[in-house]
Amino acid sequence: MSGPSSPSSTGHWDSTTTKPPQFAPRSHNDVYPFILPKRFRGALKDKVTIITGSAGTIGQALAECFAVAGAKLVLTYNNTPPPTTLKERCVNLGASDVSFVKCNVAELKGCEDLVKQVLQTQGKVDILINNAGANSLGLFDTQPPEAFIHELAVNLHGPYYLMRLLLPHFKSQHSGCVLNIASRAGTVAIPYSTGYCASKAALINLTACVQKELDVDKLNDVHLYSLHPGGIKSVMTLTSQILPLLNLHPPPSTHSAFTQAFDTLYDDSPYLNGMTCVALATGLAKHVLRGKYVDVGQDLEDILAQAEAIKSDENLYALHTSFLGGLENGGTGAGEKPGDGLKKSAEAEGGKEGFEFPGF
């Protein structure tokens, strides 16, 4: 996408401007031309790919998309195994191999056993997709602590365990990709979903922090991403999940409108997330988006066309806090250095720089 107000497809901009121009990426709720499966057929042939939470809607779609790309699939589940037809579907789509492994990612021992088994049987791991998730809706002060702790264990501890176990392997082979399925809930505050929001926010920042460490070591071929998979109808997003809350909030007169709005929020195809993950796993965006938070509903081609804009602003596609007047997170204003504010205050008072407690 290019035009009078858009950067070229190479991501360059007029050097006379202070900042690269930006335009809003196109929005999608289904697979679009840039990530069509036929473009990636066989692109990940024989790449050993672990997908956690493979029994759910998002997990099955991920498996099918990576099958098209020719990956060797290791599909994990905990309580509910994937449907028996999933293996056949994936093989028919082009998967190099498909195996199922029972694993509770909330437990370190389970993650250790999984990694050991995969390395013994496959000899390597190329791609890790942390997709398993848990969400226990409820009032924070009445919800059992066990529910909150379980959400942290599945949504944060599990990805941490597997990343921690596989990172030395990725470093030694100088390649590897981690796709952490986070959520937009990790970027906003949502009532009655405290554990989910908190754990997903932590997952987004965990991804960014680990990528920073890899970049320091110039291990750019080990690339990590956190993603909002879109609004997808699944067991976790059924309106029945929120019915207990409607007995408390909001008032009964708004229940119908509330449930209808809840339904319309979840109309994205799970294959939109699946094919975005395939595209990222090939490395086509690692020069721009590694370590970043990606909303799969945004056109990836449009994002890549603005590579320079993203590189010039570390707050893009990242968790970010804003303050009044452009005050930066380090406590300084735009163009200021730490301590400048104290100097200004002292000058205004006609005194010296500095302050002696308690000052009266």
Label the predicted regions.
Residues 139-152:
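Substrate-binding pocket helix/loop in short-chain dehydrogenase/reductase
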